[in-house]
C-alpha cells in the first residue's frame, strides 16, 4: 500500500472515532435549558438592541425567568409586555421607557460626512445600515429600531437620530379599544325570530 492511502485511511478512522466520541458526549453531557426561557425569548422581538440593559434578547429572557421586570423592552412595546405578563402570570406593567410620549426615531447618516469606516454597520444589531469599506453608508428606515447604538461608534458624528413623521402606515392604531359589534349573529337571530307567512 502506498503511504498516501495509509494516511487517508488513518485519518478517516480517527475522524470516525472522534466523531463517535463527540456524538456520545453531546448526548451524555447535554445541558437542559429552562423551557420558560425559550418561551420568553420567542415573545421578545429579537432586535438584540441592548435598550433593556442586557446584551441581547436571550440574556433578558433569562433575567425575566429569574424575576426581573418584564417592561424593559422598547422595541417590543406594550404588546410584548402584555404577552410576557400573560405567560409569567403577573400584572401588566407600564413600559419603563415611557413609550406613549416617546417619538419614534430612526438613524440618518449625513453621507457627505461619512468616511465609510463601517463602525456603524458593526454596531447595528438589526443590519439596518448598508454600505461597504470606504463607501457611503445609508440606513434602511423600515429596518431601523431607533436603538441609538450606531451613533456612539461613528468617528465623524455623521449619524443623527431623526423623528419619524406620523403617517397612516406607522400611526399607533389601537384596535383593541375600538368597540366592534358582531352583527352576523344579530342578523341570523333577527331572521329566525321573524314570523313565517
UniProtKB/Swiss-Prot annotation:
Binding of [4Fe-4S] cluster 1, residues: 49, 52, 57, 73
Domain of life: Bacteria
Binding-site residues, [4Fe-4S] cluster 3: 124, 144, 147, 150
One protein family per Pfam: FeS
GO biological process, one term: electron transport chain
One GO location term (cellular component): plasma membrane
PROSITE patterns to which the protein is assigned, alphabetical: 4FE4S, 4FE4S_FER_1, 4FE4S_FER_2
Domain 4Fe-4S positions: 32-90
Keywords on record: 4Fe-4S, Cell inner membrane, Cell membrane, Electron transport, Iron, Iron-sulfur, Membrane, Metal-binding, Repeat, Translocase, Transport
Cofactors, names only: [4Fe-4S] cluster
Enzyme Commission number(s): 7.-.-.-
Major location (coarse): membrane
Cofactor binding note of this UniProt entry: Binds 3 [4Fe-4S] clusters.
Record-level Gene Ontology MF annotations: 4 iron, 4 sulfur cluster binding; electron transfer activity; metal ion binding
Protein localization: Cell inner membrane
Family: Belongs to the 4Fe4S bacterial-type ferredoxin family. RnfB subfamily.
Listed PANTHER family: ION-TRANSLOCATING OXIDOREDUCTASE COMPLEX SUBUNIT B, OXIDOREDUCTASE
HAMAP family per the UniProt record, alphabetical: RsxB_RnfB (MF_00463)
Protein name per the record: Ion-translocating oxidoreductase complex subunit B
Species annotation: Vibrio atlanticus (strain LGP32) (Vibrio splendidus (strain Mel32))
Gene transcribed to yield this protein: rnfB
Amino acid at each position: 500500500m502506498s503511504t498516501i492511502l495509509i494516511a487517508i485511511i488513518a485519518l478517516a478512522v480517527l475522524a470516525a472515532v472522534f466523531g463517535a466520541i463527540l456524538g456520545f458526549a453531546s448526548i451524555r453531557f447535554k445541558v437542559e435549558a429552562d423551557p420558560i426561557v425559550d418561551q420568553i425569548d420567542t415573545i421578545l422581538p429579537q432586535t438584540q438592541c441592548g435598550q433593556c440593559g442586557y446584551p441581547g434578547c436571550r440574556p433578558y429572557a433569562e433575567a425575566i425567568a429569574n424575576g426581573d421586570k418584564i417592561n424593559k423592552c422598547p422595541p417590543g412595546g406594550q404588546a410584548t409586555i402584555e404577552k410576557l405578563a400573560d405567560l409569567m402570570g403577573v400584572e401588566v406593567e407600564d413600559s419603563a421607557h415611557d413609550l406613549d410620549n416617546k417619538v419614534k426615531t430612526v438613524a440618518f447618516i449625513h453621507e457627505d460626512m461619512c468616511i465609510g469606516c463601517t463602525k456603524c454597520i458593526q454596531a447595528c444589531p438589526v443590519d439596518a445600515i448598508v454600505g461597504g469599506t470606504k463607501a457611503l453608508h445609508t440606513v434602511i428606515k423600515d429596518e431601523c429600531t431607533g436603538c441609538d447604538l450606531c451613533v456612539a461608534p461613528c468617528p465623524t458624528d455623521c449619524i443623527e437620530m431623526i423623528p419619524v413623521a406620523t403617517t397612516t402606515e406607522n400611526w399607533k392604531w389601537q384596535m383593541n379599544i375600538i368597540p366592534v359589534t358582531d352583527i352576523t349573529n344579530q342578523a341570523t337571530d333577527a331572521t329566525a325570530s321573524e314570523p313565517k307567512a
